Amino acid sequence: MKLVLAEKPSVAQSIAKVLGAAKREDGYLEGNGYVVSWCVGHLVELAQPEVYDAKYSKWAYADLPIFPMDWQYEVSAGTKKQFGILKKLMAREDVASLVCATDAGREGELIFRLVYHKAGCRKPFERLWISSMEDVAIKEGFENLRSGTEYDALYEAALCRERADWIVGINATRLFRPFTGRP
């Protein structure tokens, strides 16, 4: 059995139709040797500063800049149910491997990998890389799956972008907020 993880429900439904996974369950579709589920965007995100150190719960200029030494991730508040479903699916004994079917690009790769790592999954995964949701493109994509490790550099680039955004965003917001007159 392969677990296919798409970025959004609509994409998962298109993929499931092509693969013959027609049995609907809560948060996924199953059939024909496949379980097809989805992420609903970013299920896992970087933790807020106060998770790293309680002193960051109060904004103080003296605490800037904030540079985490060990990056921490949390399941997004509004996606805990779907994350729980994905974690259970990844742990199923009959699921031997996964297919990353998130959007073809840096962010899609990041979305899949963060869920995969946060769920503690160690099963092998392959990458579906398609730019069309036409049935023929999906079928061809599944006939040409690539090893997930071929996209490690793309994942690393996404991590760098995400962490750089966090560093600039958190520090700039805390630095300049007093000058805006907003609490």
Which residue stretches match the model-derived regions?
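Intrinsically disordered, low-complexity regulatory segments
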Residues: 1-179
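Functional cation/ligand-contacting sites centered on basic and imidazole/sulfhydryl donors
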Residues: 183
